[in-house]
């Protein structure tokens, strides 16, 4: 069985280019510098041409275009890393899929993220008084270190959430077989590191060159990559400081910047 992960977005919270600020150090002539907000699509298949079990991680504000570009016709589940706007505010763009599939979508959140998302988007879970819109989501709880299993046409996909420090809150990363996704992290606890040994691919936050209170800098990301020793590493959550071609030249051969639409194949 194989896993295919598509980078739907690899930009920082404002994307690249940023409204009112432009491209920064990024060359606008390089298509891989145009970055939507962070999200990935995970697909598990028994064989290459089989139907897939399909899981989305986060609903970015760019979700509509992300799903259209990847021709997503169904989802078996959505996993959320944390409650920040750049990871949740596209949630209503799941509604057309619910109408097409004729069923609600299973969403997985930790307790804090659930409370925040329900405050902002409660109508997605329960029809509010006076509304004719039915709910579109069915909630399930995520707990760090406790694997969840998502069934779909490609078989059961296992997702292992792990807790990370993200500035003054916690966020979740996920391990899917030989791949781990850690998009928003400023410190990686030892218990999480223990779950990230022996990876084929690590997708890791590397916001900018200089330190940031809520995200890894490039140097911090490279240090963790060196410590964990994945076969391959992909840098995501990239700010306007980080030009694709320049960054590609600066990192080791087994490390590369993400770009929107990038696909990664690994094992389940």
Task: Set out the residue ranges of the language-model regions.
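Active-site-proximal loop/helix segments of hydrolase catalytic cores
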Residues: 168-172, 176-202
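Binuclear metal-ion centers of metallo-dependent hydrolases, dominated by the metallo-beta-lactamase
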Residues: 145, 189-268
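Thr-Gly-centered strand-to-loop micro-motif
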Residues: 161-162, 182-184, 204-205, 235-236
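Catalytic metal-binding/acid-base residues of hydrolase active sites
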Residues: 62, 84, 186, 207, ...
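A conditional alpha-helix N-cap/helix-loop micro-motif detector
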Residues: 33, 60, 185, 211-218
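Binuclear metal-dependent hydrolase catalytic cores
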Residues: 1-182, 248-267
């Amino acid at each position: 069985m194989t896993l295919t992960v598509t980078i739907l977005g690899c930009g920082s919270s404002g994307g690249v280019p940023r409204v009112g600020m432009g491209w920064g150090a990024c060359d606008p002539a390089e298509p891989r510098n145009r970055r939507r907000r962070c999200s990935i699509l995970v697909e598990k298949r028994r064989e290459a041409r089989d139907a897939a079990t399909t899981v989305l991680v986060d609903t970015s504000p760019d979700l509509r275009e992300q799903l259209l570009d990847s021709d997503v016709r169904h989802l078996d589940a959505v996993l959320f890393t944390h409650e920040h706007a750049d990871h949740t505010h596209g949630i209503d763009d799941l509604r057309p899929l619910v109408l097409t599939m004729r069923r609600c979508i299973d969403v997985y959140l930790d307790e804090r993220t659930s409370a925040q998302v329900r405050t902002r988007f409660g109508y997605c879970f329960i029809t509010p008084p006076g509304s004719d819109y039915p709910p579109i989501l069915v909630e399930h709880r995520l707990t760090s270190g406790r694997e969840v299993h998502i069934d779909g046409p490609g078989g059961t996909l296992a997702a292992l959430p792990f807790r990370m420090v993200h500035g003054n809150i916690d966020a979740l990363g996920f391990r899917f077989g030989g791949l781990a996704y850690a998009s928003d992290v400023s410190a990686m606890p030892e218990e999480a590191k223990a779950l990230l040994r022996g990876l084929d691919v690590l997708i890791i936050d590397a916001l900018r060159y200089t330190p940031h209170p809520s995200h890894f800098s490039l140097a911090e990301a490279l240090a963790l990559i060196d410590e964990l020793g994945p076969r391959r590493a992909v840098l995501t959550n990239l700010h306007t400081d980080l030009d694709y071609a320049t960054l590609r030249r600066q990192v080791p051969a087994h490390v590369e910047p993400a770009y929107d639409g990038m696909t990664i194949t690994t094992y389940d």
